[in-house]
């Protein structure tokens, strides 16, 4: 899975607890 900062196209590309940002990178939901 992709860690924070990894490229993603959907949330499922990221590790558990991470979301896919609009710019295409995984991020922790609690961060803005």
From Swiss-Prot:
Highest taxon listed in the record's lineage: Eukaryota
Key words of the record: Disulfide bond, Ion channel impairing toxin, Nematocyst, Neurotoxin, Proton-gated sodium channel impairing toxin, Secreted, Toxin
Disulphide linkage map: 1-15, 8-20, 14-26
Chief subcellular location: secreted
GO MF term list: ion channel regulator activity; toxin activity
GO terms for cellular component: extracellular region; nematocyst
Keyword ATP-binding: no
Subcellular location: Secreted; Nematocyst
Function: Reversibly inhibits acid-sensing ion channels (ASIC) in rat dorsal root ganglia neurons. Reversibly inhibits voltage-gated potassium channels (Kv) in rat DRG neurons.
Protein name: Acatoxin 1
């Amino acid at each position: 899975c992709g860690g924070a900062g990894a490229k993603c196209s959907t949330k499922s590309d990221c590790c558990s607890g991470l979301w896919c940002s609009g710019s295409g990178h995984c991020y922790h939901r609690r961060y803005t």
